[in-house]
Amino acid sequence: MAVISRDEIASYCRLDEDALIDEAFLLAETMESRLRQKGAVDTAVTHATFCLAVKAMTLHELDHPGEKYPQGIQDMINELKFAKN
């Protein structure tokens, strides 16, 4: 799986401690799974949005655990769910 690398998530979330980076990477894998379970489409056309959604969902979960996603993230999720293959 892992559409984004450990380094990408560390950079996006501005993390510099290995323990936090490891936690964020595991969380990113969980966010990727959630997106797929919600029916999000990851194709050549949607790949950039899919990766950005994983990063944004991960950062949001790190900063605001358990809170509802902001509208921008929700819009990306909806766009991916209704994307054509």
Question: What annotation goes with each model-predicted range?
Answer:
Residues M1-N85:
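Divalent metal-cofactor coordination and adjacent catalytic microenvironments
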